[in-house]
């Protein structure tokens, strides 16, 4: 699959450091309030949880703090991300972290055994999302949740202003990276995501926009899983 590094002209280490630095902006109080209200009540205890495209595993660390009884798995295509996650401390059991490209490799889970699959700012990078969505659908247990958190289309001026003002990217090379990433991050509209989820056999139970140009969808399998 394409990577954020190849698309944005960054090294693995540069992307890792940006993800670590921006984690609280991406997964702050508003995110966890939404999670507690709209996602957590649907989960059994204990739960089996996958973060697909887990990056430096900070979201898994957050989940471990809030749901210490959960069995956590993280998958990412970049070895440096997995290595970072393995160095973190976690309440309860340490997540199983594995290098895996879900666009070409199946998830190592039996069908119908996972309660939550989270995918944050990753699916838009994958050229053919429907096979990946089918694999997520396969592993979800009855009543399981797919939590999709991804970019939605926005005007170029607003996108570049966000990179400058929120991400602090002000150098000439930052602007060049912004122009390279704009078509990737503005690939899908909200309606496109809604259609993709429906086409893949999911029903949207809830959705919210907590950050500019990002939308969260809480989806479950439609009909037999």
Regions found by a protein language model. Give the residues of each.
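C-terminal alpha-helical "lid/dimerization" subdomain adjacent to the S-adenosyl-L-methionine
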Residues: 149-200, 205-208, 213
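Short glycine-centered segments of the SAM/dcSAM-binding site in methyltransferase folds
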Residues: 48, 144-145
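Conserved class I S-adenosyl-L-methionine
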Residues: 1-45, 58-62
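Short conserved loop adjoining the S-adenosyl-L-methionine
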Residues: 106-111
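A short glycine-rich, Lys/Arg-flanked "PGG" loop and its adjoining helix->strand segment in the class I
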Residues: 130-142
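Short catalytic micro-motifs in class I SAM-dependent methyltransferases
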Residues: 121-122
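A conserved beta-strand element that flanks and buttresses the S-adenosyl-L-methionine
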Residues: 118
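Class I SAM-dependent methyltransferase SAM/SAH-binding core
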Residues: 50, 56-105
């Amino acid at each position: 699959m394409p990577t954020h590094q190849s698309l944005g002209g960054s090294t693995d280490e540069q992307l890792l450091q940006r993800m670590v630095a921006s984690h609280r902006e991406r997964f702050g109080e508003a995110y966890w309030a939404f999670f507690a209200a709209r996602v957590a009540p649907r989960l059994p205890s204990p739960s089996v949880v996958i973060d697909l495209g887990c990056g430096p595993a900070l979201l898994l660390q957050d989940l471990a703090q809030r749901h210490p009884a959960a069995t956590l798995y993280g998958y990412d295509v970049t070895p440096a991300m997995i290595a970072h996650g393995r160095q973190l401390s976690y309440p309860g059991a340490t997540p199983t972290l594995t290098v895996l490209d879900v666009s070409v490799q199946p998830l190592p889970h039996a069908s119908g055994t996972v309660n939550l699959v989270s995918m944050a700012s990753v699916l838009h990078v994958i050229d053919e999302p429907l096979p990946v969505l089918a694999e997520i659908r396969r592993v979800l247990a009855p009543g399981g949740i797919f939590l999709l958190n991804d970019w939605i289309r926005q005007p170029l001026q607003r996108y570049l202003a966000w990179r400058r003002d929120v991400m602090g990217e002000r150098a000439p090379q930052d602007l060049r990276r912004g122009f390279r990433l704009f078509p990737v991050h503005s690939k899908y509209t909200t309606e496109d995501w809604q259609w993709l989820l429906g086409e893949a056999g999911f029903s949207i139970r809830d959705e919210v926009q907590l950050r500019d140009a990002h939308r969260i969808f809480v989806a479950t399998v439609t009909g037999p899983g």
